[in-house]
Amino acid sequence: MEEKPKSTTPPPSVSSLRQKFEQFLDKTDKGFNATRNNYRGPVSSSTGIINDKEKKSHSYFKVREEGSNKRPSSFSASNPITPSSPQSTHSSPIYRGVGYHQYSSVNSGNSYSGSGNNINNIINNSNNSNSNNLYGNNSNNQSSGSLGNFLIDKLEYSAATVTASDLKRERQQLFRNKEEFTMESSSYGGSTIGDDDLDSLNGSSSQQFNHRNSSWADRRERFIKKVMNGQFNEVQMRDELNRLRDIEADKIRAEERRTPSMNMDEFKAIEIERLRKKIYQEELVIFRQEEIEKIQREERIKIEKEYDDKSIISSQERQHIVQQIINQKEDEKGSSPPFPIPLVVNNNNNENNENDNNNNNNNNNNNNNNNNNNNNNNNKNIDLTSFNNNININSNNNEIKNNVIVDSDDEEELERLEQLRRQREIERLREEEEENEDRVERELASRRRQEEDRIKREEEEEEEEQRNYLRRLKELERIKQIEEEEEEERERQSQLQSSQQQQKSSSTQRSSNTVTSTSSSSTGGDSNPSTSQKPTNLLNLMGSNNNISNINTNILSHSIVNSSGGLPPPPPTASHVDNRSRSHTLAGESHSSENTPLVSSIDNNGVNNKMSRSHSGGALSGLALPTAPPLPNQPNVNNSNNNNNNNNINNNHNHSHNHSNNLHQSALKNSSSMSTPSISPSQAGNSATSTVPSSPISASTSMSSPTLVVSPRKDELTTSTGSTRKGSISEREDKKKVSSSSTSSSSSSNGGLSSSGKDHKKDHSSEEKEKEKKSFFNKLFSKEKKDHHSSSKSPSSGSSGGGEVDEKKKKKLSPRVGTPFNVKHDVHVNFNADTGFEGLPKEWEVLIKSNFQEPEVMQHPEEVLDVVKFHAQYQGLASAPAMHAPSIPLTDEPPVTLNDLISLDDPKKIYYNINKIGEGGAGEVFEAINSRTNQTIAIKKMKLKAQNLKTVINEIGMMKNSNHENIVQYIDSYIVADELWVAMEFMSGGCLTEVLDQYRDIQLNESQIAFVCQEVLRGLEYIHKFNRIHRDIKSDNILIGANGEIKLADFGYAAQLTQIRQERNSVVGTPYWMAPELIRGNNYDFKVDVWSLGIMTREMAEGEPPYLEFPPLRALFLLTTQGLPPIRDAHKWSKEFNDFLALCLEKDTEKRASSSSLLHHPFLKRACSGPEFYKAVDAARIEKENQLQNFANLTAI
């Protein structure tokens, strides 16, 4: 037979299925055989190429070897067909060509395999099963045979859908996402078969098949049926397969379009949600089952209870029967398996009984009795029906079956009851636990409410006390103002009366006064006591602390007028008076005449009595101070001037004093215990041979004690001239003008004083003023008297007429009194070398007695009082002078408020995993994670109160404006309820104190100490550069980072120096680390931080700061009096270390080094690195954990 050339193109495409079929019928068997021979060679070669491309491109057409045949496991990537599925068995003709080619590529394609028989059988079966051809009238047996041969030819030796172009197009579509693609029919040389054509091929007039909406399985089955019926040629099968693939690809692409692209996190979230829903559904099913079981159990229990109530046997009998059954089963445990098998034993017995009954049919009654006995003895039936109904068993078989059922029911019933009892017990325990938890929560809530109510009540009470205190202060201020106005009015009247009386009496008593003044100015001081007895008694009465309150105000005013006009000559002084007294510096106001002496008081027996201490300006009665060396003697040149002046003054005094003597005769009897009078500075300075009487604050023989001066009182005091005094000693210049102007007429009538006497008086007054300025008590309380000085000045005596009316209007009390401000609590203290301090508050006395010894108080009174005052202010005692907040803002700009510093965000939404890690005096510290940055930060929570508001604002402002690598970074601050949350940088290494607490086991070497000092100095240099002071440098405020970073923290006590206020004097900080100038209350600057750094350096070297073994008050006293103790084992430390300490701990602030200069010290060159320092931190942390573990083990034992 002549071979036809190989066809390179498929059959031409037609539009109608009938045309295709007619073209198909024209082919004969011969043509088919020729076509088969022509296609064998090329197909095998092309199949090899295809197989190579499949290996290279990793096609989705995978094959599985079943016996000697290989079949693909799937057709396309989007529509897999598993070989194990039942549908895959129907598709063997479709993929038969592929399996054959893969097989023939190995066997050169020259022989048929066993698969040919299989497909022949399939085709023959299909032809035999379809005797009537579906293609129409032209079909016959020959066409059926030719169709079978064609299918054998085309399906066995050629691939159904796989070609090189198919693989290329499939691969391109796989990597071109979401792009439409179809397999065009032109590539196969055929035409596309529509749904109408397929339906017409099937010959069905029913509804057309919907490819788009049908499933893959339906389309596959439809295609297989058509192939099995022989309705497709090669082109049609390819087109149909392409159609099926395109439909599935379109569905997949449409699904991808509806489903947006997602990343891995979203995919995980979706999967988690899907699993959660699945678990929820499963839990719901389980829950429903449990509910159903619960309802069933309840119903069963209800039925059992009703059944028990109807039972004829009692509960005791039932329990007895159950107990017998349990005992019997325990006895049989030795021969029985570990689990009970009651039914098996009963069956065996029953079988034996059945055999006996079969053998002995005549003895039925005996067997029945035996069965009954076995039932009673072995089973102990608790079936209540047998007892209630008393059933008589007639047949042995029925009795055996009943026994088996009863035994099984009894066992199940017991197990069910036991399980029910356990469940009830579990539920009861669960309910009790829930009730306990609810009760605990209610109790906690009630306690929390009670605590909040208590705190609220305490705050309200504090506010009420504050309001009452302010109200009392207002009332006191009002009363005081009224009294001052009344006293000023009386003083004006007395001055007017005294001036009138002086003019009337000056002309009548001039001669007699001249003689009296001459005798009073003698150097020996031997004047007649009788001539001055009456005025002396009057002044003694006025100076007495015991009787001053009993004198009528009008009489006192009259006596003041008489005394201002003139005074009798001074009495002779006793020889035992100490000449070393310097208490004249405490004398009252200056007299009308510069050299007028004070008059001593003489009792009825003619004995000199010292004047009360309250007379000379002291704040307390009965207090004493150590005396001073005697004053230098003055030349006798001014004696004549003194005599002349005394003549003129005493001229007017005798007349006025005679009038007042009769009014106070009754009061003079009580003045016998008066003390020695005081002498004014003018007397002491202008009398060459006069002796200076002892101070009203006592004359002592102690020479070592320093001279102290009594601080002034705020209430009114009567001076030696009779005028009232409302101010402190520093007001004498103002008072001097008043008294001098009131007596100017009398002094001018006698010719005045000589110029030399005036000059000497001025020189001596300036000396006394310098002494007062240097006085300890003035220095201590001078700042608290500034406002009082300006308000207590008395008006001049020469004012009259309209001037008096204007002053009245100015002094008139307004109907509304404003809120008091700058309220002070002055403490008036005196020192006696014999008795110690006098006039101290009770708290101060307790502090001194409990912390100081008597010799220390005598030797260092100023230091003791300094330390006590500092401690009182630091501890906030009630009687301590108030610490006034600085009125200067932190900067020259307007002051910052809390609203300017806080953020309005909710910190609970920003931070999570908030865990407490510590607490202190200022508040609690928490560790949290910032959700925005995913960084660990620290949160400091503080209660907002009026007392700490300024401190909080100061700390936040300082941290916010400080950006340095050695200062803890500030993040933000928030207000949550009544708390302030300050978010800052988290330092995982803790504070330096935690390392120093392990000093016994871990000591820092010099390089590590130098590293800490270097980092701290860098931070101090930064804040000092911006004129800020930290004022609380200590180990607790030095924080350590994860890599050994050192940073400053806690700026609550920090201060900002300004152009106006370049120094500070407020008492803040921690006592053991405070500089001496800060303890004494002197002005200080940046150098206090350097001192604190030196103390902290010693703390790192010795494990604790100096004097830590003493109480704070004692430590402060030792620091101010004895200085710092020498460092322990000084020889172990290098010369540079000791020099660095000396520069830091220099008492003289001028010589003390600054932070910038210390950064260049040679000691800091030995500093180690941060990681090396952190080794010590890590070792201290491990040591602390070990200690805690050991302690926990001990407590557990």
From Swiss-Prot:
Its main location: cytoplasm. Residues 34-49, 70-79, 524-536, 593-615, 718-727 have a biased composition (Polar residues). Residues 19-30, 51-69, 439-458, 728-737, 757-790 have a biased composition (Basic and acidic residues). Keywords: ATP-binding, Chemotaxis, Cytoplasm, Cytoskeleton, Kinase, Magnesium, Metal-binding, Nucleotide-binding, Phosphoprotein, Serine/threonine-protein kinase, Transferase. GO terms for molecular function: ATP binding; metal ion binding; myosin II binding; protein serine kinase activity; protein serine/threonine kinase activity. Its cofactor is Mg(2+). Phosphorylation on Thr-585 results in cAMP-mediated activation and localization to the cytoskeleton. One of its GO terms (biological process) is regulation of MAPK cascade. It catalyses: L-seryl-[protein] + ATP = O-phospho-L-seryl-[protein] + ADP + H(+); L-threonyl-[protein] + ATP = O-phospho-L-threonyl-[protein] + ADP + H(+). Disruption phenotype: cells exhibit a defect in completing cytokinesis when grown in suspension, suggesting difficulties in regulating cytoskeletal organization required for cytokinesis, although karyokinesis is normal. Its EC number is 2.7.11.1. It is found in: Cytoplasm, Cytosol; Cytoplasm, Cytoskeleton. It comes from the Eukaryota. Residues 911-1164 form the Protein kinase domain. Pfam families: PBD, Pkinase. One of its GO terms (cellular component) is phagocytic cup base. ATP binds at residues 917-925, 940. Regulator of the myosin II component of the cytoskeleton: required for regulation of cytokinesis. Functions during chemotaxis, required for maintaining the direction of cell movement, suppressing lateral pseudopod extension, and proper retraction of the posterior of chemotaxing cells. This is Serine/threonine-protein kinase pakA. The lineage of its organism: Eukaryota, Amoebozoa, Evosea, Eumycetozoa, Dictyostelia.
